[in-house]
UniProtKB/Swiss-Prot annotation:
Keywords: Aminoacyl-tRNA synthetase, ATP-binding, Cytoplasm, Ligase, Magnesium, Metal-binding, Nucleotide-binding, Protein biosynthesis. GO terms for cellular component: cytosol. Mg(2+) 2 binds at residue 418. It comes from Shewanella woodyi (strain ATCC 51908 / MS32). This is Lysine--tRNA ligase. Transmembrane segments: none annotated.
Length: 501
């Protein structure tokens, strides 16, 4: 897809370029001054003086300096937008004449600075009289007259700068994203977690089951991988004595694009010594409930046709029980036991009976997870912890004491999608060694997402990892819930896009 420029738009661009040439010839700083002191924001002015009468403002003689982008022209009034909101500027007849002579007039999209007295219009709108003014940046390309006219979603994502200029909902979504990240960070610090940074390039990819991006380090002449997860490095820090650590950063997975997936995405991953997966679930409830109330004023948030209640307590049920709950009419599923789940032929037949396409290398645990994803996952609208993940799909998680087929692991679902993954960490070095070897066998059998063997991590475990619990929370998916958006591209400023034709 190539950017389409209509003939009328070409004409407008040419006219604006001609204006810029005039400005360069007649104005200082080559038409791009950098000496305007913006002292006030639109929203602050509106909040402070929005309730004053016209007469009160006249008597106060308030001077304000504003700067921003012209979003509309209404006779002598210009609507100026800055990061906080909008306010008007008024150009009297003499000012209009000067604007015409100096700049050949102002256009929508131009960035200007204005200083003058604050007034109230006859319609009750605050405005700054243009007593002093500068054209700070001449916009050469016109904005869409109405954002409704920019209906191509790809254009919104490829030209996010235009999207942010003209779409208030988009701006608010990314403001909320920033607030969510800050609130999570503050929560973790208050809980005495230390924020750390671990490598983004790994010599051995690990910490998750995913296909990595590969690159080459020229000086060392070795293959390097963009990290798929920081887990193994963070647990090395717990071995080293940092008992509570967290990291908010990017992960990279060489996989497909979808409303829930982007090749690079943001995770908050944390580890706490002397805790188990039950402690993680409790902490997650406390975190999300407090953040929702802090940022939105209520733990109950709208999401599509639903209302998601972050207030807690959150439902907790095993993967097997969830499959049974959401397949009430399937007699085979209703009578299914863990002994049958361990029978790979039984699980394959069950998956096929559900119309699923299966891979030859799928284990019993993978089949159970796929059946869960096919029949139950999308039903989990309210916050729900799904426990009882099989050990063969949880190579870094501690086995359950009562049922060694499963682990002390959960995934956290809201709005029908996974938002977090956590577990009691496997700190048995010999068991971890065996599970890494099983992952190597799976990779040899065709599973591209199976983990690599990491000998140094085994060495770290042999020094002793205390009982530890760790969790990763998908920031992008969480922000989707807080902003009531349904594609991950709406909460990532510059999402991955297919090349334009």
């Amino acid at each position: 897809m190539t950017e389409q420029v209509l003939p009328d738009e070409n004409k407008l661009i040419a006219e604006r370029r001609a204006k810029l040439e005039h400005i360069r010839a007649n104005c200082p700083a080559n038409g791009h001054p950098n000496n305007f002191d913006r002292k006030h924001k639109a929203a602050d002015i509106q909040a402070e003086f929005g309730n004053n009468t016209k007469e009160e403002l006249e008597g106060m003689g308030i001077q304000r300096s504003i700067a921003g982008r012209i979003m509309a022209k209404r006779g002598p009034f210009l609507v100026i937008q800055d990061v906080s909101g909008r306010i008007q500027a008024y150009a009297g007849k003499d000012v209009q004449k000067d604007l015409k002579a100096t700049f050949q007039g102002l256009d929508i999209g131009d960035i200007i600075g204005v200083t003058g007295q604050l007034h109230l219009s006859g319609k009750g709108d605050l405005y700054v009289n243009m007593e002093e003014y500068q054209l700070l940046t001449k916009a050469l390309r016109p904005l869409p007259e109405k954002f409704h006219g920019l209906t191509d979603q790809e254009t919104r994502y490829r030209q996010r700068y235009v999207d942010l200029i003209v779409n208030e909902d988009s701006r608010n979504a990314f403001i909320m994203r920033s607030k969510v990240v800050s609130a999570i960070r503050n929560f973790m610090v208050k809980k005495e977690f230390m924020e750390v940074e671990t490598p983004m390039m790994h010599s051995i990819p690990g910490g998750a089951s995913a296909r990595p991006f590969e690159t080459h380090h020229n000086a060392l002449d070795i293959a390097m991988y963009l990290r798929i997860a920081p887990e193994l490095y963070l647990k090395r820090l717990v071995v080293g004595g940092f008992e509570r650590v967290f990291e908010i950063n990017r992960n990279f997975r060489n996989e497909g694009l979808s409303p829930r997936h982007n090749p690079e995405f943001t995770m908050m991953e944390f580890y706490m010594a002397y805790a188990d997966f039950n402690d993680l679930m409790d902490l997650t409830e406390e975190m999300l409930s407090s953040i929702a109330t802090e940022l939105c004023g209520s733990p109950q948030l709208p999401y599509g046709e639903h209302t998601v209640d972050f207030g807690g307590p959150y439902a907790r049920l095993s993967m097997l029980d969830a499959i049974k709950k959401y397949n009430p009419d399937n007699a085979t599923i209703q009578s299914m036991t863990y002994e049958e789940v361990k029978d790979v032929e039984f699980m394959r037949d069950l998956a096929k009976s559900l119309g699923m396409t299966i891979e030859k290398f799928w284990t019993c645990g993978q089949l159970l997870e796929e059946i869960f994803g096919e029949t139950a996952e999308t039903q989990l609208m309210q916050p729900t912890f799904i426990t009882g993940y099989p050990a063969d799909i949880s190579p870094l998680a501690r086995r359950n004491d009562d049922n060694h087929f499963i682990t002390d692991r959960f995934e956290f679902f809201i709005g029908g999608r996974e938002v977090a993954n956590g577990f009691s960490e496997l700190n048995d070095a010999e068991d971890q060694d065996n599970r890494f070897k099983a992952q190597v066998d799976a990779k040899d059998a065709g599973d591209d997402e199976a983990m690599f063997y990491d000998a140094d991590y085994i060495t770290a475990l042999e020094h002793g990892l205390p009982p530890t619990a760790g969790q990763g929370i998908g920031i992008d998916r969480l922000v989707m819930l807080f902003t009531n958006t349904h594609t991950i591209r709406d909460v990532i400023l510059f999402p991955a896009m297919r090349p334009q034709a």
